[in-house]
């Protein structure tokens, strides 16, 4: 499958929905994923152990859920129909991930965009997004292939500890600056007023009104 074929089938190029665009979530989830695997030339579910559709998972509250696609130790994937809320989809797959041994990559897709969320232990989470209109761009396709072929490349270089230590250093620098200001021997005296231009008389003094207490006739 070529990028143009994929976009024409699953997208709406030029505002014209493709033949698979209107499929609901259940109808389109697996066929979209299989077409994506063919486009990217990556293994399809069932080709290796621990990689398949509909991975059963217990979620909070004792309910049972299913990750649409799961590759053990690599990713859990949740598919939605076009226009569905992908933030809600992420919360859904997060609720499965604990029971699925916390795969480091969580992917959500509404078939019009694919969002890759990383959750490597000890590292900050990062998000990458590829829209269907970008599926003909080699760098975007390479990014998606890395989910299967090089998942560790999504691990951020910085760790949570790096971020905490950097924040602590920044706070320490700020606190030291404030301490030095407080410890300085008083503020510098204000600058003298500018000299009066030559020939200008000094300002008149403010008049003072003296009030005398009235006195009655002198005692005789």
Feature map (PLM): residue ranges:
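Extended, well-ordered alpha-helical scaffold/bundle regions in very large, multi-domain proteins
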Residues: 3, 215-220
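Acidic-basic catalytic patches of nuclease active cores, encompassing PD-(D/E)XK
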Residues: 14-52
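Active-site metal-binding core of divalent-cation-utilizing nuclease and nuclease-like domains
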Residues: 43-72
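N-terminal, well-ordered alpha-helical segments
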Residues: 30, 34-35, 67, 91-94
């Amino acid at each position: 499958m070529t990028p143009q074929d994929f976009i024409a089938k699953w997208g709406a190029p030029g505002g014209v929905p493709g033949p698979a665009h209107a499929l609901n979530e259940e109808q389109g989830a697996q066929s979209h994923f299989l077409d994506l695997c063919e486009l990217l030339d990556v293994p399809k579910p069932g080709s290796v152990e621990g990689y398949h559709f509909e991975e059963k998972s217990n979620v909070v509250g004792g309910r049972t859920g299913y990750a649409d696609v799961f590759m053990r130790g690599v990713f859990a994937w949740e598919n939605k129909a076009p226009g569905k809320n992908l933030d809600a989809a992420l919360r859904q797959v997060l609720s499965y991930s604990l029971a699925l041994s916390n795969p480091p990559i969580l992917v959500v897709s509404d078939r019009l965009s694919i969002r890759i969320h990383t959750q490597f232990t000890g590292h900050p989470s990062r998000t990458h997004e590829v829209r269907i209109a970008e599926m003909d761009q080699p760098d975007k396709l390479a990014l998606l292939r890395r989910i299967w072929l090089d998942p560790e490349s999504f691990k951020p270089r910085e760790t949570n500890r790096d971020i905490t230590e950097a924040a602590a250093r920044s706070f320490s620098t700020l606190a030291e600056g404030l301490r030095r200001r407080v410890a300085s021997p008083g503020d510098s005296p204000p600058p003298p007023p500018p000299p009066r231009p030559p020939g200008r008389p000094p300002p008149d003094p403010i008049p003072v009104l003296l009030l005398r207490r009235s006195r009655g006739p002198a005692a005789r």
